[in-house]
């Protein structure tokens, strides 16, 4: 079996409605994958542009004995739906999706998060959203790689 088929076969689908007004609450299928060791410390891996969660194939394999790993492909990327035009792709919409996956789908309360490239911008925005929740749902550790956004996480 090739890497792509193996990655796809290990995934599931979650449904997401865009929260960007211009997208008219259009629902999309989002590819989600959980791998590693259930019950081990949770690790959320967030992909960059123009890639997908499969970028983490080798890393997930290396870390699978030490972590319970959670990943998704943002809409328009990888194995998730490619919404038709005039869909607006938004860092904030992707951050809301990430928060939804962490808190509602995966139900993580203690986790680490590693982000890359555009995923770091999404991760920083999500961090602000997670910090505003009651109780806050921020990661224990956050590792940003190629981060380009600067978002305040302190109360105004």
What are these regions (language model features)?
Residues 115, 119, 123:
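Gly/Ala-rich beta-loop-alpha elbow adjacent to hydrolase catalytic centers
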Residues 1-43, 64-67, 89, 106-107:
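Alpha/beta-hydrolase fold catalytic core
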Residues 127-156:
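Flexible "cap/lid" loop of the alpha/beta hydrolase fold
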Residues 68, 110, 138-141:
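Residues at the starts of beta-strands that form the adenosine-phosphate
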Residues 31-79:
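Conserved HGGG/HGGXW glycine-rich cap/lid loop of the alpha/beta-hydrolase fold
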Residues 57, 99, 124-128, 145:
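Short, hydrophobic alpha-helix immediately C-terminal to the catalytic nucleophile
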Residues 19-28, 33, 74-114, 128, ...:
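Active-site loop/oxyanion-hole signature of alpha/beta-hydrolase fold enzymes
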